[in-house]
């Protein structure tokens, strides 16, 4: 067998990538350095050469998980603040988080499991992810809320915009979390794509957007133009929800 010699940076990245699914499945406290070394195909001595402690490795995972910016978030920055963008970004957020739209299924599953385990431990991974999401997405969301209200398509709400943002995100996230077990734990009626579309309406209605605006800006063609690869419910289903 030919041994491939990796430089320090590549070796560290390999160890992090090997540790990610372990932390996702078992959590930080229950994952041993021996398991990490075996998964990374290195000795524990080499593991400790790159990461002095398991905590140091976990901290690197926190940085690694937020290092790359999702291309979809960069695309979002270029969109004009409007009612249409508010509807489109909500459709994408729910589909991306809850069904894995435009993402690698294995990576998405790992991220969700890391989040759930983080809630049960120190919460640090979840805090960093949420801070990252807020920094990238909330400014556009808030601008869209203001634009929709100015256009007369959004009624004034007693709910703080920040809470509207997080409550919507948490609806989408919980749809994903209840599907983590082999047999989905959420007793929803209908297929996941149908439930995701209903979740979009639930969120947008809660924000205060009118049914007419939701239906108008949920046209399949417009959504696909903004987010290539998105195939939402047929227009007939959207119209039925607006009645």
Predicted segments with their positions:
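Hydrophobic alpha-helical connector segments
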Residues: 60, 74-111, 161-165, 196
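Secondary-structure edge/capping motif, primarily at the C-terminal ends of alpha-helices
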Residues: 76, 119, 179-183
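Hydrophobic/aromatic residues within well-ordered alpha-helical segments
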Residues: 54, 61, 65, 69, ...
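Helix-turn-helix
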Residues: 14, 22-56, 60-64
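Conserved hydrophobic residue
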Residues: 28-29, 124, 154
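Short helix-capping/turn signature of helix-turn-helix
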Residues: 51, 116-123
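C-terminal peripheral helix-coil segments that are non-catalytic and often amphipathic
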Residues: 2, 92-103, 135-151, 155, ...
